[in-house]
Amino acid sequence: MERSDLPAVADLFTRTFRKNNQATDSQLAGYLETVFFSSPLYTPDVGSLVHLNETSTIDSAILAMPVEFIVHGRPVTARVLCAFMAEGKSGAAGAARLARMLRAARQDFCFTDNASPVSADHWVAGGGLVLPVQSLEWHRTFRPAAAVLDMARRRVKLLAKLPLQGLARIADRFVRRSRTSFAAAPHDGVTSAPISLPQLMEQAQVMMERFSVHPVFSKPEFDWLVAAAKLNTALGELQCRSIADAQGKVIGCYLYFGADGRNAVVMNVFCHERQEALVVAQIFADLDNLGYASAQGMAQPFLTQAVLRQRHLVHKHTGYFCLVTRHADLKEAAIGDGFYAGGLASESWSRLLHDF
């Protein structure tokens, strides 16, 4: 894909995923350029792909952005696939050609965390994997009335103009008084504090060493990912905190989006081995104490047992986490416990998921 293709790709995206829109959002092409062309890692070899039909019209496309990973000590630039779209019969044929280009035998590393069932089948047919745990999101409720109101406001914009927040607060006081399990409790002696983004990265780099496959998050790339993620203002403010045990030793840190009194979206959780239960309990206690109605995040195998200890928590499936690679050691790590991806190292922060 070239920059000159962006207006046509924006129109194709709108016709494919936003069929109720009468016209393409005027900001969409610019956003596509920011996300898919401005990364410090961008090269055409790891960029997006388009297919032209016999009239030289774009009838199918795969949007992709690069994220650098460490795979058993060696750097590998992954393609994060963010949207797969096609239109008409020629588009279906073009999509099949694009999909063949991304078969496992040809790729160092490609993945998505938001594939549809049909797309997931294509990934598997192309030699790829579906990771079942990472295909789930956990959702924890702290204030049920406020959580229901927040969800309703996202679906019915008119509700955002009505003064219903006060009623939700009154209802939640009563509910939390009668059902104390809605409150999240930390472990004794564990504390947390806000930290800067550079501090988060300094701590996370050490904690990611437990995984044989994990993002590099070099300073140029991390700064770019943060700047791109912050464009999604609907998620709230991007914040991070560090967690320490009773002796004051840092055992974990996390990055999240939060909007006052609404939903918190946990992007990334990092921790030392065997500290998962303490870290996860503190995260939920923090978000509860900060007044959020609810919280959500991508399920991760290394955190699953700790997350499942929470009350008023459910797992939801919104899209499949799929990957393809020609490297056997990467595939082995993904199947086992040596793989870390998601959050900033995914498309979960993208405005394309719910905006435009």
PLM regions and their residue ranges:
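Short, surface-exposed connector motifs at secondary-structure boundaries
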Residues: R100-R106, N289
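Glycine-rich acyl-CoA binding loop
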Residues: K89-L102, E276-V280, F284
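Amide-forming acyltransferase catalytic core, primarily the GNAT-like/NAT-type
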Residues: P7-V71, V76, L129-G261
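Active-site/acyl-donor-binding loops of N-acyltransferases
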Residues: F109-R176, A228-K230, L238-Q239, G252-C253, ...
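A short, internal acetyl-CoA/4′-phosphopantetheine-binding micro-motif in the GNAT/acyltransferase core
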Residues: C82-A92, N268-E276
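Residues that line or immediately flank small-molecule/substrate-binding pockets and catalytic motifs
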Residues: M65-P66, A83, G88, N114, ...
